[in-house]
Amino acid sequence: MYMYAIMDTINHPKERNMDKLYIVIPAYNEQDNIEQVINDWYPVIEKHNGNGQSHLIVIDDGSKDSTYEKLKQCTKTRPLLIPITKPNGGHGATVLYGYKYALKNGADYIFQTDSDGQTLPEEFEPFWKRRQKYDMVIGWRKDRQDGISRVFVTKTLKLVIRICFGVNLTDANTPYRLMKAETMARYIHLIPKDFNLSNVLLAVIYKKKGCSIKFLPVTFRPRQGGVNSINMKKICKIGKQAVIDRK
């Protein structure tokens, strides 16, 4: 048995828990949800702890409520949790801030989800198992439970991306994605720091650059609180910017 363990270490020098995972979660005015979100996702970072180097990064985007204070309270019993606060810049800018923080601190893999309770940590493992095969594994909200208007917005965004960028992406803006840090490091500079839909543009860039992308179906529950980060105005803006960039 001991010999098998040695051979397994030789054949697989970088074990599962040696990969440094950074989970990035933006939060804005989520005082009613944030503790539950931490309770949900902290076990994931504990399991994939990267020999103590993995972290759950929750970025308070200038909340006007007690979101950040509650985050700090949560750190007392959760050493892998790192709360960050910054001036309000919107979801896209906050996600980008988190990605850059993860890259700067040596992440091997970066996972992003939101703080509204719509996603399930129980569905993370299929993403993690595919981490080495794909540059990006994105959730596909096959059966959305957050209303027909949100389905319409997603379909409209998909059409805008196809028209403006000439690529087809199943669900470009899903806040449930696992990414190789080394791939992200090559392309993140192409995204403006104040861009509203950073995840969308990142997926488009990966597709245009020929990176490997895999979509997996995920559950997407009704929003537990807060305000949606994407709307028709923002979709029109990304389309307008794409037209300008192509001139």
Features from the language model and the residues they span:
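Short beta-strand/loop segment that forms part of the nucleotide-sugar
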Residues: G50-G62, T85-P87
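Conserved donor nucleotide-binding strand/loop of the catalytic core
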Residues: Y68-N105
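Conserved donor NDP-sugar-binding/catalytic core segment of glycosyltransferases
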Residues: E125-I148
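Conserved catalytic loops of nucleotide-sugar-dependent glycosyltransferases that act on lipid-linked
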Residues: G90-V95, Y99, G147-K247
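A conserved acidic beta->alpha catalytic loop
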Residues: D60-E69, G117
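Acidic helix N-cap motif at the loop->helix transition within catalytic regions
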Residues: D32-Q36, D65-C74
